[in-house]
């Protein structure tokens, strides 16, 4: 982990898709990080090891992401627009239940955005 509390795998591999975990609760850091080797040579991962609900911070952290792992925050229509229309995100993976309460599924489907749980 560096001074900015970010765990990042294979940052030099810009040929690989980038998965971003923009926020996480402390108790989930180690379990997630323990599985990062499974994605070696498949995807780069950038995990921010803190929790915030600040929209601007979340958008800044995900600006280069192709996929976002969502833990504990809602993807409002404005965030969905910023990440998919103006950004590069093509997949949201949710770490919990009730995904339909966290993202507008019809809009995501209409845009061809993959939503996983």
Can you describe what each PLM-predicted range is?
Residues 66-117:
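Phosphate/diphosphate ligand-binding glycine-rich loop within oxidoreductases
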Residues 1-67:
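N-terminal glycine-/charge-rich "phosphate-binding" loop or analogous flexible N-terminal tail
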């Amino acid at each position: 982990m560096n001074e900015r509390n970010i765990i990042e795998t294979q940052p030099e591999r810009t040929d690989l898709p980038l998965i971003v975990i923009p926020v996480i609760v402390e108790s989930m850091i180690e379990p997630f990080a323990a599985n990062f080797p499974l994605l070696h040579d498949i995807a780069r991962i950038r995990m921010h090891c803190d929790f915030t609900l600040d929209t601007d911070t979340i958008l800044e952290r995900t600006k280069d992401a192709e996929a976002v792992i969502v833990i504990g925050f809602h993807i409002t229509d404005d965030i969905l627009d910023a990440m998919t229309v103006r950004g590069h995100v093509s997949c949201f993976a949710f770490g919990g239940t009730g995904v339909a309460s966290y993202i507008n599924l019809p809009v995501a489907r209409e845009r061809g955005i993959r939503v996983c749980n």
